[in-house]
Swiss-Prot record:
UniProt-recorded name of the protein: ATP synthase subunit delta
Membrane topology: Peripheral membrane protein
Main location, first listed in the record: membrane
Gene Ontology cellular component terms for the protein in this record: plasma membrane; proton-transporting ATP synthase complex
Keywords in alphabetical order: ATP synthesis, Cell membrane, CF(1), Hydrogen ion transport, Ion transport, Membrane, Transport
GO molecular function annotation: proton-transporting ATP synthase activity, rotational mechanism
Subcellular location: Cell membrane
Amino acid sequence: MSGMHGASREALAAARERLDALTDSTSVDAGSLADELAAVTALLHREVSLRRVLTDPAQSARPRPSSPSVSSAPRSAAPVDLVAGTVRSRWSQSRDLVDALEQLANIADLTAAQKRGRLDNVEDELFRFGRIISSNTELRAALTSRSATTAAKSELLAGLLGSRAERTTERLVTRLVTAPRGRSLESGLESLSKLAADRRDRMVAVVTSAVPLSDTQKQRLGAALAKVYGRPMHLNLDVDPEVLGGIRVQVGDEVINGSIADRLEDAGRRLAS
């Protein structure tokens, strides 16, 4: 989804603005909206020919075909209007429309968590789940197996997350696992984490240290990184005794080793004084 260009990027930005306006209304249940958007996403992912017709620029000069399946997927007016506006936009390729609808569904779920004051928990849980997956090959194999049924994967996730994680976390991960749409589990979790951070207009730093950081160290490192990057910074923390230099910080594609991190902290203190 991050690879959208040109018309698709503009269409996605407009769709996200419409979604934000919709979820700002107290009468709209963001969680239910997420379910309905996810249903449309699944439908258009299956119906490739329909998706291509809906995104064909040649159709823009005349009414687009109406599909009973698409029109009946959302059950209330709000998602119908949102989906209709998104479909009417110009998309560079048909897959971009499905990617956009999926992203809208995920954002709606994250918005629901934000309204409940639970977004920080969801961010942390997505990161921790990613770390569990990377260290447990058997679990990863079970969740990505093509021979396992959707029901079996959902049941496994319910057992893992149901009583331990936020409901939003379970919903997001379950959708990703049961409908990966060609993505790896790791890249899907990373995309979800970025969306969660984006809800607060902040960046994510993955901090791996040889020993757990103290609260003071976390606060100082977060403040220093925020000053350097010019945006609030959410720290995803991991401990690995084999980390060279004692600490490793990754912000996007940029990796910062321990010595540079120390200089960042010093710079942050000087700016604050």
